[in-house]
């Protein structure tokens, strides 16, 4: 059986993403500013700096580490993979990029007093509530702990995206598209996988397994 090949778009650290994908039998191909190439079985949009707020009609109000070349490259990849009908998985920044692509917007900087956000390592850990009939609900149940590395979050949800997990009923932590093989999570499942995860935090590997199985389903029909 041919391995599932995943294009991973990234800028900074890539090791944890590659480790997770290999652990579930996939072959990751990691690139910074990849050209449009839909020969891969799926697209993983990884974490990183903030998206230029001009993409959702706002000026700079707290966004940092903007990489306009990366924004443009990943927008082009999103368009191509959607047109090709291939699965897309967004993590943290990738989750936010999917939301913006579908017409949503972001809170550019969460309040410093909000214990939910934490840009440091070790990260904050908090509970999320998931919809029972969602990807996450089927994998983990409706109540579980995740890590938190981000300082931005979904403000308005993109068109047709279905919110499937939230923190305290306030912030969207995950979504999925009802008809397209597209989903995203705000936390970093690759940072808590297998035996390396923090006590009580959900294991990220089942999510990567789901993504790879989805890619195989779409590839093999």
Task: Please annotate each region the language model reported.
Residues 140, 145:
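Conserved ATP-binding module of the ATP-grasp superfamily
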Residues 146-151, 175:
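Short catalytic/ligand-gating loop segments at beta-alpha or beta-beta junctions
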Residues 171-178:
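Short, surface-exposed beta-strand/loop micro-motifs that present aromatic residues
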Residues 1-93, 100-101, 107, 111-139, ...:
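N-terminal beta1-alpha1 cap of cysteine-dependent amidohydrolase-like domains
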Residues 160, 178-182:
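Beta-strand-turn-beta hairpins that frame and shape the catalytic cleft
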